[in-house]
Amino acid sequence: VTDTKATETTDTAYPAAPALSNAEVAEHDISHVFHSWSAQAKLAPLPIKTAHGSTLVDFDGNEYLDLSSQLVFTNLGHQHPRVIEAIKQQADTLLTIAPAHANATRARAAELILSHAPEGFAKVFFTNGGADANENAIRLARLHTGRDKVISRYRSYHGNTGAAIVATGDWRRQPNEYATGHVHVFGPYSYRSDFWAESEEQECERALQHLEAVIKGEGPDTVAAILLESIPGTAGIMVPPAGYLRGVRELADKYGIVFIADEVMGGFGRAGEWFAFQA
């Protein structure tokens, strides 16, 4: 015998949300939500109700073109039907699982990623986000080399957690520079060259000379990792000159340093190849 009352669900269990205006949503948001990287007394967020493709729609029915793909992560556009369907199917099967267990979906995702990775990549370490990925990459580099220092660039962004924010190369790291062992260098930027370069080739050569000088100055046997965005994103889409990333790879190999390519913004097809360092 089945108790129909015990299993019955009704539409009244989750009543539909009332129609809201931009002004109402903004008021509630500002009152209750802490916005990162923002002066809380000066918040003026744009309320967004839904989106499709590259179009955002607010609560008053106005449409906007999403030129930044949010934080450069909506590669396939908003509300792509195949993505939504895949999320629904996985939610019906299993919502979450501890990392100690095996899971077919996660294993298949890792297999697909590795099928597009260059030779030498054997496993995928899944994390919750970019800062988390960089934190773990730094820890792995230090464990692998037995060294401490991490060299990263000015005009960079690597996340807002302990070591990631200190590796970040803009002023926002300064109130919280508690992680140790971080050194910054200038990267190539032909538009406002720090090396008085007159050509892309010269900019590349001098930026690599500068990086090697810092490695030598800090002591090669103290440097665990070079952490770079393949294409700096938050500081401006600064595409490196031809040969720069290859030169960094050669310096890392020369001194036994781990090269960490932060591609949270630049990877997975955004630069024309699966990984930006291949472009």
Show where each model-derived region lies:
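Conserved N-terminal phosphate-binding loop of PLP-dependent enzymes in the Aspartate aminotransferase
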Residues: T2-A279
